[in-house]
């Protein structure tokens, strides 16, 4: 059992250790100690407050309007013995038992406690308490508390939220690039504006094909390509001309 270690600063809340869950909360409960250890005045008198039941312990928080040396009182199940539920005829039901002091709990020895439920619910609270204590015996003590994350792990920058609905992992097969594949060298940029990919069926040029020499450019303005299936005739222009505008070909020079 520990004294004044389980309440918030203004006593309007309870401090529950990591790994535990809140099972029940009862208001208007009176706590007293018919038998207490000598040499401590924190157990004197009757305290009124709220009783909390977690998966590993019982915590009592005195009302914030009450001034006294005891602000909170915590009792782990493994330090409680002789637990009973009393049902007086002309008084409210109460839970009674013996509690041992916990190491570094703020007091030493043992004491007998009494919890009176002015709003009812003592039997239900005791049943849940026994069930939770049985689980502790079966599964062991609570796990170690979760501490702060290691240095360097902070909150994500603004704008980084959860992915939209339907967004999942990439399809299988998308992994690292094969060995030898690296980034493009400096100067390799994207295609110019207006560039379109070649239509389907255009593949790599045949072996032995070389690029045309420098200076070979496209046809001058006004020239159009020959219709499909028409090959170029030797020593004739590929451009169509009217009969009256045909150019005379120069005579071949004699060798």
Swiss-Prot record:
Record organism: Macaca fascicularis (Crab-eating macaque)
Domain GRAM: start-end pairs: 15-87
GO cellular component: nucleus
MF term (GO), any: transcription coactivator activity
Domain of life: Eukaryota
Sequence repeat placement: 139-145, 146-152, 153-159, 160-166, 167-173, 174-180, 202-208
PANTHER family referenced in this protein's UniProt entry, alphabetically: POSTACROSOMAL SHEATH WW DOMAIN-BINDING PROTEIN (PTHR31606:SF2), WW DOMAIN BINDING PROTEIN 2, ISOFORM E (PTHR31606)
Residue ranges of coiled coil: none
Function: May play a role in meiotic resumption and pronuclear formation, mediated by a WW domain-signaling pathway during fertilization.
CDD domains in the record: PH-GRAM_WBP2
Protein name per UniProt: Postacrosomal sheath WW domain-binding protein
Pfam families: GRAM (PF02893)
UniProt-annotated stretches for the region 6 X 7 AA tandem repeat of Y-G-X-P-P-X-G: 139-208
Keyword Metal-binding: no
